[in-house]
C-alpha cells in the first residue's frame, strides 16, 4: 500500500473570500494553527477546556482521558451529563425558546415549523410515555422511521431517559432490520405506518412486522407507530401503540436522566458490511462535544443561519448534523422528507430559494445526478433559482471529483461560497479533515487538513510515516473524544478492524488510502484501501481515474472498480453515466474508445479502463452512496448475492450486466 501512485494533479486554488474571513468563527490560517498548537502542546488540556466551555455538565469530570485499557479509550468518564438537556434546555435557558428549531418539509411540499419550546415539550411528552411503558436507562430502542420531526423526537426522548437508540435506515429490508434488533437486544421498536418518498408510500410497519416475526426478536415488547399517512396497517393488541397515544396526557416536562459521559448514546450499524452487522457504539459526552464543535468550526454557524443537511437520520450524518449538532448549537435547520428529484430535479434549489438556506450540506452523488439533470433540462438548472441566500456549501459521504466540485462552486455557490469537503466516518462521530471556510485555501477534490486536535497521518503497511507526495494508509495517531468506543458485543472485531496489530495496535485505521501534497501537506482521499487497483504492478486509487473520467464534458458520473486479468493482474472496469442518453452498439464502442484515450491523456496509458459500461445511472443506496461492491461483482461477471435492500434503483443491475 505504501506505493499508491498519485497520477492526477490539481493546481486550482480558491482562497476564502475576505468578507467571509472577517466574520468567521476561525478567521485565517493563523487562528487554525494556534488551535492546532494548543492541542499539540497540551492534548488533554485542549479537550478539557473545550468540554468545560461547550457542554453543560450535571457532574463535572475530573479525569480527561483514560488510556489504561487501550484501544478502549474513555473520555471525561466520571463526568455526568444528558444529551437532550444539552440540545433543548440549553436553548430554553439562553433565549432561544421561541426560535424555530426545525423547518420541516414533506415529500409533497407541506411546510411546518417547530420552535425549541415546542420541540422540548414534544420530546418530554414522548420521553414520559416511554418511561410509562417501563423503558429505562440502559435499554436499547430501535428506531425505524422516515425523515420527520417525529424521528428526531424519538432519538432525543431516548437520550433524555438514558435509553440507547439504534436507528435503522428506512430503506433496509425486514431481514436487515431483524439482524439489528437481535444484535442490539432491543426492548422496543419505534416505526411509522408508511414513509413517503418521491410520491410513493413505502410500508415501514409491514416490514417491521415481518422482521418481528423472525427468530430472536422476542425481547421487543413494545412497537410504537408514528401515523404518517394513516395507512391501513396490521395491529397487534398489547404490543402496538400509536405514537400520539403514547404522548397523550403526558406532562410537557420530563426530568432528564444524567448519564456518565461514556454511556452509549447510540449504536449505529455501518452499511455495506458483509456478514454480521457491525454496531458502532458512540459515547454521550465526547460524541456530543464534537457534533457541537464541528457545527461551529466547519459550518461557521451564526445565530441567524438557516442550516440544511440533506442526509437521513438512518446514517451518521443525520445523527451528528441533524438530530444532535444543530440542536446543541441552537441552529434553525431544514429537515426534508423527500428526494432531490421529486416532483422534479429542481427540488433542492427551490427549497434553498424558499427557505433562504445559508448553509447547504449534501453528498457528491446528489450533486452529480443534479448536474446531469440540469444539463438535460434547462428548467431545473440552478440558474433558474435565486440561491443568493447561500454563504457556505459542504459535501459529505465520499470524495468529490474536482469537476463536480467546480460545478457546485460555480452554479450553486455563485463562485462566492467556500466548500467544506468533509472527510469523516460513522466510526469517527464527526468531521476529521475539512477546510475551515474562513481560513483554509480550497483545492477542488481535497479535504485539505485535519481539524485541531485530530492527529491524522499517512503511513506504510508497517505503520511508519511516508513522506508527503507518497500515497499510503490513512490513520489517526491519538484517540479523540468522538471516536467509536467498540463494536457492540464484539470487542475483538473492534480491535482487529480499527487498531490492527500490523500497524502496531495503537493507530486508528481509517480504511482509506491517502496522499499529502508535497508543498501544502493537504490530504487527498484516494478511495478505500480495498478500492486500490494494481495494474501491471502500478497501484492506483479509483478516485483519481473517476475524477479523470468526470472531467470529460460528456460524462455526468463514473465509478471505477478492478477485476482479475490474466495479463495485467487487475483490469480497470469503469461504469459511466453520460450527460445524454445511454449509447449502445457501435456508438457505445466509439464513445468508450474516446473515453479510454481521454483517461490516457489525463493520467497516462496505464490508467486506461479495459472495460467501459454505460448505464442510465449507477447502483446507489438511498443515502446516495455508490454500491461499489455490487459493481465489483458485475465487473467480474458474478451473480449478485449481497444484500440489495438499500438499493434505490435495483433495475440498473440488469442494465449494467447487459452492457458487457
Curated annotation (Swiss-Prot):
Its cofactor is Mg(2+). GO terms for biological process: acetyl-CoA biosynthetic process from acetate. Keywords: Acetylation, ATP-binding, Ligase, Magnesium, Metal-binding, Nucleotide-binding. CDD domains: ACS. CoA binds at residues 197-200, 317, 536. The keyword DNA-binding does not apply. The keyword rRNA-binding does not apply. GO terms for molecular function: acetate-CoA ligase activity; AMP binding; ATP binding; metal ion binding. Mg(2+) binds at residues 550, 555. Acetylated. Deacetylation by the SIR2-homolog deacetylase activates the enzyme. ATP binds at residues 397-399, 421-426, 512, 528, 539. The modification N6-acetyllysine is found at residue 625. It holds the Pfam family AMP-binding. Its EC number is 6.2.1.1. GO terms for cellular component: cytosol. It is an enzyme of class 6 (ligase). It catalyses: acetate + ATP + CoA = acetyl-CoA + AMP + diphosphate. PANTHER family: ACETYL-COENZYME A SYNTHETASE, ACETYL-COENZYME A SYNTHETASE 1. HAMAP family: Ac_CoA_synth (MF_01123). Belongs to the ATP-dependent AMP-binding enzyme family. Catalyzes the conversion of acetate into acetyl-CoA (AcCoA), an essential intermediate at the junction of anabolic and catabolic pathways. AcsA undergoes a two-step reaction. In the first half reaction, AcsA combines acetate with ATP to form acetyl-adenylate (AcAMP) intermediate. In the second half reaction, it can then transfer the acetyl group from AcAMP to the sulfhydryl group of CoA, forming the product AcCoA. This is Acetyl-coenzyme A synthetase.
Amino acid at each position: 500500500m505504501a506505493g499508491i501512485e498519485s497520477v492526477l494533479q490539481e493546481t486550482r486554488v480558491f482562497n476564502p473570500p475576505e468578507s467571509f474571513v472577517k466574520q468567521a468563527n476561525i478567521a485565517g490560517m493563523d487562528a487554525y494553527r494556534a488551535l492546532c498548537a494548543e492541542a499539540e502542546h497540551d492534548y488533554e488540556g485542549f479537550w478539557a477546556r473545550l468540554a468545560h466551555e461547550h457542554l453543560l455538565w450535571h457532574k463535572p469530570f475530573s479525569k480527561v482521558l483514560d488510556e489504561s485499557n487501550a484501544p478502549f479509550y474513555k473520555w471525561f468518564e466520571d463526568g455526568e451529563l444528558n444529551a437532550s438537556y444539552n440540545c433543548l434546555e440549553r436553548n430554553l435557558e439562553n433565549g432561544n425558546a421561541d426560535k424555530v428549531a426545525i423547518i420541516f418539509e414533506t415529500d409533497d411540499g407541506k411546510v411546518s415549523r417547530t420552535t425549541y419550546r415546542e420541540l422540548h415539550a414534544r420530546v418530554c411528552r414522548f420521553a414520559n410515555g416511554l418511561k410509562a411503558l417501563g423503558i429505562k436507562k440502559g435499554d436499547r430502542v430501535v428506531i425505524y422511521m422516515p425523515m420527520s420531526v417525529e424521528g428526531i423526537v424519538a432519538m432525543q426522548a431516548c437520550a433524555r431517559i438514558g435509553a440507547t437508540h439504534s436507528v435503522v435506515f428506512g430503506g433496509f429490508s425486514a431481514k436487515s432490520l431483524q439482524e439489528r434488533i437481535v444484535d442490539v437486544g432491543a426492548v422496543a421498536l419505534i416505526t411509522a405506518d408508511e414513509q413517503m418518498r418521491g410520491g410513493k408510500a413505502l410500508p415501514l410497519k409491514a416490514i417491521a412486522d415481518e422482521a418481528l416475526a423472525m427468530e430472536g426478536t422476542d425481547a421487543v415488547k413494545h412497537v410504537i407507530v408514528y401515523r404518517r399517512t394513516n395507512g391501513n396497517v396490521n395491529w397487534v393488541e398489547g404490543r402496538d401503540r400509536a405514537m400520539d397515544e403514547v404522548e397523550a396526557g403526558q406532562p410537557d416536562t420530563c426530568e432528564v436522566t444524567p448519564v456518565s459521559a461514556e454511556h452509549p448514546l447510540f449504536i449505529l450499524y455501518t452499511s455495506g458490511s458483509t456478514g454480521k452487522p457491525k454496531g458502532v457504539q458512540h459515547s454521550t459526552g465526547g460524541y456530543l462535544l464534537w457534533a457541537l464543535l464541528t457545527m461551529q468550526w466547519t459550518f461557521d454557524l451564526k445565530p441567524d443561519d438557516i442550516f440544511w443537511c440533506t442526509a437521513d437520520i438512518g446514517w451518521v450524518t443525520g445523527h451528528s448534523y441533524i438530530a444532535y449538532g444543530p440542536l446543541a448549537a441552537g441552529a434553525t435547520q431544514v429537515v426534508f422528507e423527500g428526494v432531490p428529484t421529486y416532483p422534479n430535479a429542481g427540488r433542492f434549489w427551490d427549497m434553498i430559494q424558499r427557505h433562504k438556506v445559508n448553509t447547504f450540506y449534501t453528498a457528491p452523488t446528489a450533486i452529480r445526478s443534479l448536474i446531469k439533470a440540469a444539463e438535460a433540462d434547462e428548467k431545473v438548472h440552478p440558474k433558474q433559482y435565486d440561491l443568493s441566500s447561500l454563504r457556505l456549501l459542504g459535501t459529505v459521504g465520499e470524495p468529490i471529483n474536482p469537476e463536480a466540485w467546480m460545478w457546485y462552486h460555480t452554479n450553486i455557490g455563485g463562485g462566492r461560497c467556500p466548500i467544506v469537503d468533509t472527510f469523516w466516518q460513522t466510526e469517527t462521530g464527526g468531521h476529521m479533515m475539512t477546510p475551515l471556510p474562513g481560513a483554509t485555501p480550497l483545492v477542488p477534490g481535497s479535504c485539505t487538513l485535519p481539524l485541531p486536535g485530530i492527529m491524522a497521518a499517512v503511513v506504510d503497511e508497517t505503520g511508519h510515516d511516508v513522506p508527503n507526495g507518497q500515497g499510503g494508509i490513512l490513520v489517526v495517531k491519538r484517540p479523540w473524544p468522538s471516536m467509536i468506543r467498540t463494536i457492540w458485543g464484539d470487542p475483538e472485531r473492534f480491535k482487529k478492524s480499527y487498531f490492527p496489530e500490523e500497524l502496531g495496535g495503537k493507530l486508528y485505521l481509517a480504511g482509506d488510502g491517502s496522499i499529502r501534497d508535497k508543498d501544502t501537506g493537504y490530504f487527498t482521499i484516494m478511495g478505500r484501501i480495498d478500492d486500490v487497483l494494481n495494474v501491471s504492478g502500478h497501484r492506483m486509487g479509483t478516485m483519481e481515474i473517476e475524477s479523470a473520467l468526470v472531467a470529460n464534458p460528456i460524462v455526468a458520473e463514473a465509478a471505477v472498480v478492478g477485476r482479475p486479468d490474466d495479463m495485467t493482474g487487475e483490469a480497470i472496469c469503469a461504469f459511466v453515466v453520460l450527460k445524454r442518453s445511454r449509447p449502445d452498439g457501435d456508438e457505445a464502442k466509439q464513445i468508450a474508445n474516446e473515453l479510454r484515450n481521454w483517461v490516457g491523456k489525463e493520467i497516462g496509458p496505464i490508467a486506461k479502463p479495459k472495460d467501459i459500461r454505460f448505464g442510465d445511472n449507477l447502483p446507489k443506496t438511498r443515502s446516495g452512496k455508490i454500491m461499489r461492491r455490487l459493481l465489483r461483482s458485475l465487473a467480474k461477471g458474478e451473480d449478485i448475492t449481497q444484500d440489495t435492500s438499500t438499493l434505490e434503483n435495483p433495475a440498473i443491475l440488469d442494465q449494467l450486466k447487459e452492457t458487457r
